[in-house]
């Protein structure tokens, strides 16, 4: 009996654990150690700094099952997913790694033992082929002489990519740095499938499938191309879990393995699809994996960066669901089946299941509103197409108006053997960006152009006043030697107590002074390693190399400190009350209030808001010390410090601890003790995007001022209802009850008036060809009363056509009622449409009842006069 995908994953990890490897958990899909990577796309990503010698681990051998995404950027498999047997946006990479420990001999023998041993994968040896780099005699000899692979199944691959060391069998991290030859293992599916062995003209066929790549990092490539031997050669291997599962489960497509069979069945169930061979089922089954795990790892659908790639994948899945005939939101329903098939590998996803489902459901509901209209427009454009390429302008219009990512449009075109002018799309996109830049403000932001080579030493953790030297001056974005009174500028100092805006905390304000000049600082920004003081010179002249006294606005700084410390307490309290899925998604900390964005899938309940507020105030009353410590990033994480999603940290980080309640990485300014905050009050809780909530709050003096405002308001209301604060609720309730009673009495009077009006009107009905017709313009009647009057008149007249109108605030309100016995000849909707167009309006409704509005009050009498002839022509 073949192994399940989950059993294969576990067997791989167990095998290498038995060989002395540390089993390391999969890292997040959002790389935190490589800003050049959009998503984690290989098992070695989390060990990159170890291979580069920048990081050390407590182990020299490791094994992982790493979650990977390839969609967007250099490694983009999105357009092929669903159309081939092996492309995925999400996959798991099984890997074993040696950091200067074992090398080629053990790496090759480990791989062969796992693949062929009866105890492990038990693959037929005669089905396995291997490749080595053309000059890697050491690896060749190990395969041939130690392992015993026949020479005809060992293939040397040279530089087949157009340059020295540019080969399928030579791996490089970049233009410089660690690199080396690699050896790939292929499985032969048999001669009933087309394709040739690696290196042959038919190598792109599906007969010979690469299942494992073993990289031997033995060189350090220099900028001049020289290959220097590494002092400690290392090993990095990767084997796609889905590929090896297909081999071990004796199927030719990854989409036929147990994991995908179950997922595809779930997709068919939620979409109502019956053709289980549909490519759309494969697309959706693949996409739910990448989408669910990306959201679980903190990515939220948006229109930029990682969030936009996620949105593209979601919308592609929704469109394929639409093709399958899905009539309602379906994508979010696949999270539960996904968790079931992924087993232990989905433990973190299971913790955040509700949040992931909510984000997916919200995104699908938003896109569903425009999907049908967008597809109709695309169909219309394609029907008019004379060539085989859709123009970029149309593709951009679909993106801009209907939210269609260009690859979704390309998907539709591909199904019809058409192409999209993607270069034209990019031109249209760039034109929009240019228009946005041109209209974004009244003038140029010269400060954004500033580039400063020097660095500023920040002394603001311990000082609010500092003697310093001017190292650079910028006016209108350009470096100058001096500035004069009345000129706006940016001043850079060699050292400063002013905090430059970062981490959500606004920049400081204050003054730079010397004996002859005063510079008013209105903002402080960071320019690389320099800190720039933005403001205006109010007196004198200031030159480069002048000495100044830097004076921070202490009162403002202290308010900011309290608010920043409160955000840390708030973050910890939210995780305590709502759950560990809460993560900071953004913040603003200034001297007036604090704003905190966080991941959560629904609006907070009033009692949850109260609990969070109480918990923060409890920590304030505990008056815990706020302590900072600088340490290595890994040590900080081991200590439990929360790193913020999307932030890039140096190797040395500042850890801020508030007693036993909060530990976070933070470079901002803070209170000395939590008691300094004084008081914390939440102002609002709201949503900003799918799965993102926002809290605004005040502290200290701001919180006390809020209490005073609320107290004053209560006093004012108590005075108005002739009560006091103690019985205010009862007094207000009594006023509301009295108001409701009076409203009911007023409505009864209006109903009586309408009945009386109806009774007097019924006598004015005319007979038109044997049918009763009543047309009347009423004064002093509310528009909403017209419907009640029509119902009354129908009862009184038995069989009739009734047209009533009234005017208010220069607007016309119309209603037409037709008893059901007459709707075969006269339909209320048709009659009211004729009247409405005469008074500058439109309307509609059922055959027996229709309403309309208009704006031309003067035309109403003539419009009503035309009704008799209109009815007569149809009777």
Swiss-Prot record:
Its main location: cytoplasm. Binds 1 zinc ion per subunit. It comes from Yersinia pestis. It catalyses: tRNA(Ala) + L-alanine + ATP = L-alanyl-tRNA(Ala) + AMP + diphosphate. Its EC number is 6.1.1.7. It comes from the Bacteria. HAMAP family: Ala_tRNA_synth_B. Its cofactor is Zn(2+). This is Alanine--tRNA ligase. Pfam families: DHHA1, tRNA-synt_2c, tRNA_SAD. Catalyzes the attachment of alanine to tRNA(Ala) in a two-step reaction: alanine is first activated by ATP to form Ala-AMP and then transferred to the acceptor end of tRNA(Ala). Also edits incorrectly charged Ser-tRNA(Ala) and Gly-tRNA(Ala) via its editing domain. Disulfide bonds: none annotated. Residues 1-461 are annotated as: Catalytic. InterPro entries: aa-tRNA-synth_II/BPL/LPL, Ala-tRNA-lgiase_IIc, Ala-tRNA-ligase_IIc_anticod-bd, Ala-tRNA-synth_IIc_core, Ala-tRNA-synth_IIc_N, Ala-tRNA_ligase, Ala_tRNA_ligase_euk/bac, DHHA1_dom. Belongs to the class-II aminoacyl-tRNA synthetase family. GO terms for cellular component: cytosol. Homotetramer. Keywords: Aminoacyl-tRNA synthetase, ATP-binding, Cytoplasm, Ligase, Metal-binding, Nucleotide-binding, Protein biosynthesis, RNA-binding, tRNA-binding, Zinc. Zn(2+) binds at residues 564, 568, 666, 670. One of its GO terms (biological process) is alanyl-tRNA aminoacylation. It is found in: Cytoplasm. The gene is alaS. The keyword Glycoprotein does not apply. The keyword Protein biosynthesis applies. It is an enzyme of class 6 (ligase).
